[in-house]
Amino acid sequence: SLVGSEMCIRDRTLITLIKAELYTAVIGDIMDKMGYLHQFLPPHIRPLRDDMLIAGRAMTVLEADVHDNSASGGNNPLLQRSFGLMLEALDDLKEDEVYICSGSSPEYALWGELMSARAMQCKAAGAVVNGYSRDTKGILALDFPCFSYGPYAQDQAPRGKVIDYRVPIEVDGVLVNDGDMLIGDIDGVCVVPRRIEEEVFTRALEKARGERIVLKKIQEGMRARDAFDKFGIM
């Protein structure tokens, strides 16, 4: 639809701007000022490589611990399927979306090389998982942005399944809705709720540009106190 394509163009422009000028610290500062004090994912969710960046819309995925019960009965046919709905979730990724997964115990890998390859075909922006990732050499070779607890090969197949996607999820107390904007860099991952994104990014750009001026002044010899009193930035 025309509306859909206009939104895509607007998102593309916004994402380009975020990657060029913004970073998690300045975006987080603005959300703090606006009273949104719990928008950072926990600090152990880190990029697989320090220079990896993510900016894109959340495609939320709900995982749960499920003992591999394909041989047993049970009342939910979904749980008889390998990986549950993971393959459907992966195939549903759209351009500039981020596969973000939470809900399970942090005891196994929720992302890997083949998932990265498929996500790249969908033109996804990256993956953020509340757990480990594996096939690390392969993911790094693909240069696909992945944020996780780090490398650990123990697989989800006999331990967990995707039970739903494009539903609200929680990552250590941080609510993530499908379509929220996710920004990730070496300092972590922050979640910008869609309803406040316009104000957040407008103010973050202003602050980022101000910070560059303050940096220049400090490098020219200005004292920290004077810089803060004059610019209100530190």
Please annotate each region the language model reported.
Residues 1-9:
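Short, small-residue-biased leader/transition segments that mark boundaries at the very start
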